[in-house]
């Protein structure tokens, strides 16, 4: 089973690209969704986050308040690093379990979709970076996450520069909003990775 990764800034279109790869029998693992699960009440990760950031980052049910935590980490690079140090281990363990399950089920490939793909060590056999114009990413995350422009800018600016993702990538996809061009780029990479003829 081929394991590969997709990365890029928030709002670049990683999930859209990952969905296009699914037609090749690839299972899409969204690290953000995995993180949602490890933030649930009573999980060791939620407890460790509360121990580091304080009880105010927990909701009454004991789950991690992602909005509250985001306000802290996207305004302080050291706090973002601390959160990454806590979560990468738990996300990595969860992804390993998913990989074992999907391998046993006969999946053709596993595509890990993560902003912190490089730093977390989850990249696999190949890395695909997705890029998009800054203003496009800004508008996408404002709409998707219900953020103000200031919050969205702070989030984007707290992330690695686009050059970081591109320099660590084996393949680069430019997502300027043209669905046909996006699909052509995915198809070309799928051929290079041996997912199709």
Question: How should each PLM-predicted stretch be described?
Answer:
Residues 15:
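Walker A/P-loop
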Residues 10:
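The conserved Walker
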Residues 6:
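Hydrophobic anchor at the beta1->P-loop junction of P-loop NTPases
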Residues 95, 123, 143, 147-192:
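Small-molecule kinase domains that catalyze NTP-dependent phosphoryl transfer to phosphate-bearing small molecules
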Residues 22-31, 43-44:
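Post-Walker A helix-loop "phosphate-sensing" segment adjacent to the P-loop in P-loop NTPases
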Residues 96-144:
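ATP-dependent NMP and nucleoside kinases share a basic, alpha-helical "lid"
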Residues 33-107:
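ATP-dependent small-molecule kinase phosphotransfer cores
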Residues 3:
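Walker A (P-loop) ATP-phosphate-binding motif of ABC ATPase nucleotide-binding domains
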